[in-house]
C-alpha cells in the first residue's frame, strides 16, 4: 500500500540548464549554438571542449622595430583549470617573454562564432623546477592571467584527477589541438580545432613499444609521463604540445578529467607506437601547491 501506482509516477521538474552543469569538466558533445553540417574528419564542434585554450606569443612584425606592429604567434595548446589559471607543457612556454592566452576559440580564420573568444595576458608563469628540456621530464607549467576569463558556453574549466590517480588502461580519451604554427591568414595546418580519440596505454606496454623505436631497448619511461594512442590511423600529431588529454569521469556522462598534457611522440601513431603525455595526476600536488601559493582555491578543478 505504501507504493505509488506505476501509472502515476512523480516526475521531478527538468533541471535548469545552469544547475545541471555546475562545476568543472563538462564537454558540450553536440557543440554550442549551431550544428555543423557534415562533421569533417576529426573536427571538434564549436564549444565542445570549453577548457581548450590557445597560447600565443606576442612578437614584433619587425625585429628592428620592437615597439611597432605586433603579431600573435601560435605557441601551443593549454587548458583552463581555473578562470585565471592555464595548465600547459613547460617546453612551449619556458623561454617565451610575452604570452597571451585565448579561450573560446574554434575556427582561427573567422570571428563569426556566436560567442566570441577571450584574450588575456599572462602576468606570471610557474615552470616545474625539475623540468629538463633535454628529456622533457616534469614538462609542466602554469600560466596565471591578468584577469579571469568570463565563463560562457564556450569557455569553462576542466577537472583534474585526484593526486596519483592514473586513468585505467583502455579508457578512451580525447586529445585536442590546432596543430598549426600561426594564427589567422598565415596559418598552416588546422584552422578548426581538431580532436582525436585515443585509448590510455598501460605504462609497461608503452615502455615496451617505445623500446622498439629509436629510443632503444634500455629506454625507461619516466614517472612524470603516461601514454595513450597507438591505434593505426589515429594520428595524435595533430594535437599540439601543451594541449589536454581528457578522459571521461565514470558515472558522470559528459564530464571529463584531464589525465594528460600532450608532451611528445615518436613518428605519428604509425606502427602502433603510443604518444607520450605528462601524467597530471602524478603532478597534482605540484599544481595545487603553486595555485594555492598565488591565493587561488584548488577546489575549482576538483570534482
Swiss-Prot record:
GO molecular function: serine-type endopeptidase activity
Region (Disordered): 1-24
Record's signal peptide: none
Domain Peptidase S1: 36-292
GO cellular component: extracellular region
Pfam families: Trypsin
Keyword field contains ATP-binding: no
Annotated family: Belongs to the peptidase S1 family.
Protein name, UniProt field: Phenoloxidase-activating factor 2
